[in-house]
From Swiss-Prot:
Name by which UniProt lists this protein: Protein YchS
Domain of life, per lineage: Bacteria
Length: 91
């Protein structure tokens, strides 16, 4: 009986080691994949924001519209460009 109890505790210990190793491996894999991605997660939000605000129109107060566009720079910052679309020039 002593030999059987020793084998049982050894098997339990081996299962714990394997389970802990699997959990650690999954945690490291998800963290490494997230932090060392070639395409950062924050850039996805900027690109989504740039697509959503790519056609924003505002009034310039003179009857024309100011078109505001967002172009994504290589640095990841959003370059906002404003142009007058159909604005009237009053003398």
């Amino acid at each position: 009986m002593v030999v059987g109890e020793g084998l049982l505790s050894a098997a339990r210990f081996a299962l714990r080691v394997v389970a802990c190793g699997n959990a650690l491996s999954l945690a490291l894999k998800s963290n490494l994949g997230r932090s060392f991605s070639s395409f950062p997660a924050w850039a996805e939000y900027l690109i989504t924001d740039s697509f959503e605000s790519s056609g924003t129109f505002e009034s310039d107060g003179g009857g024309g519209r100011i078109t505001q566009r967002c172009a994504l720079r290589p640095s990841g910052r959003c370059l906002r460009q404003r142009s007058l679309a159909g604005a009237r020039v009053e003398p």
